[in-house]
Amino acid sequence: MSKNAASALADFLEQRAKAVRAIEAEAEAIIHGQGDQAGYVAKMREKAALLSALATDARPLVLALEPRLSETADERLERFSQSAATSLKVGSPFFMSALLYPDEHQPGQPNDLELYVAEVRSWG
């Protein structure tokens, strides 16, 4: 594996994690600032759609990793994507809002995708 392959994947995932945080911030502003439930739900759907495409979008970068890491990354990203796809099928804004956050998550802590970015960076 090239160090660049892990770095490229980590960079991509970091960009996606930042996009998710931005969507979440917009959703919070919409619901708390405007009381717009429909707008909030639309933002949660946007978040879930972005995450549901994660495994597919990252695939070329994952394939550049050495086989063991590629398999590990593929499985992990597929779990993120499957959870998001399920949340879209269920249609629950609560489920969508909880994506990437374990039950014990505290505000200010990194979410699961941000933690995974750090793990992928450690591969390089």
Give the residues covered by each predicted segment.
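Short terminal alpha-helical segments
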Residues: M1-A42
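Compositionally biased non-globular segments, especially hydrophobic aliphatic-rich helices
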Residues: A8, A58-L61, S87
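Generic structural concept
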Residues: A10-A17, R45-A48, S52-A55, S81, ...
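Short, flexible coil/linker elements and helix-boundary hinge sites characteristic
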Residues: A17, R21, H32-Q34, E66-S70, ...
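Short, charged, amphipathic alpha-helical segments
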Residues: Q37-A49, D74-Q82, E114
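Short, solvent-exposed, charged loop/turn and helix-capping segments
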Residues: L50-R79
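Amphipathic alpha-helical binding modules
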Residues: E78-G124
